[in-house]
């Protein structure tokens, strides 16, 4: 190497000037590329967040109550794709992305499916985000992808078979105060129970259960008046009574009214002294929804009927889709009677005849009268009623619906009773008595490990919910009356709760209620429990 060249090389090696510029020049390209990558990736991340928000909103909207997809799925009779939900999800996604720029080649896809009462929605997307700085290293775009999944439950379709005890014991006045009011004015069975009868004795035929000299506290034309009295103004009826110490109750009705009983109670009052009255001028009410009013005396069946009308309100407020619930009223004495069969029309008024609401409000009119051949008379045939209810559900055999579609409703039986089974029978009308009047229970006072009529229902998948309205102790007991049935009835009370618990689907399907408000609250709780358990089960 020539000497002058070696000199230049040596100088270059020893010279430290300009090193920063040279190093910067060497590192500039990768540094700028890194900064550019961060900017481009940040832009892509922001775009992905917008796309994800749109996907989340689309999935949720597709399954929201009252959305096209939700309503369409609720009407499907099987499982599969919910087309209306897919369309709705896509529309919501597109709407949320409308007006947003900064992406290309967007592809989105939605699926909405129904399986039983479960709904599932999935929204996926992919899009290209243009880049600026990354082009330096040959990258022309960033692709972002994502997915959103949502789930919901359809409201279950439920059928409610309200199996309602309307036997004589349900004619007990609804509260202690109402029982006192009735006992003070009721002439029925006064000779047997001089402290006063708290039941609205209800047998309608003359000489059927009440006679002037055999049972009554004063002459009643051989008719039972307890139920009639419970339906009229208490002050109005009291004002018809006159003092007469020759009768056990020390009272009497005007002779002209007695001879025309019971219709004379409602005939117009004629002018003149009370002793000459031939009409009472009273107006009967079909139901008594409030205790303590002068218009009537509330019976347990009135309280149950009012509670059922309130149940309809709860059902109407709770339904999420049209026709979600059907309810039927099935009272029983000896036979089960389809008083108002299953109906989806439960939003009527208690004052509108022809509606299930009106039928429920007037449930007390079905109290055992010994004239209704549909219900029969005498005793309380709970097991027979449950067997009959089973026959009404899906033909009486086989598995029942799971509530996932309108054509496969889940059936619930609501048994409302005081639980005292009595197998005696009285011919209709005004027939003779047959069978034992000794009270028992549906498990024969704990002699049966299970209750066959209840097990049949539960074995098919029917849910059985029980409302026990405690049978009231008879006090004092007249041991000479009706073969000492009062003693047997009292001794039976201890076995009732356990027997009804056996009937219920589980312990949380059993409730006890005594007062009118408790009865209303219990029925409301039973309905809400049915909704809750239907969701959990499915």
Show which residues each predicted segment covers:
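Alpha-helical structural signal
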Residues: 19-22, 28, 56, 308
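Glycine-centered recognition micro-motifs in short, flexible terminal segments and loops
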Residues: 6-26
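Alpha-helical hydrophobic helix detector
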Residues: 25-39
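P/S/T/G-enriched low-complexity
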Residues: 2-6, 10-11, 37-538
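Short glycine- and Lys/Arg-enriched binding-loop motifs that mark or flank ligand-binding interfaces
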Residues: 14, 32, 415
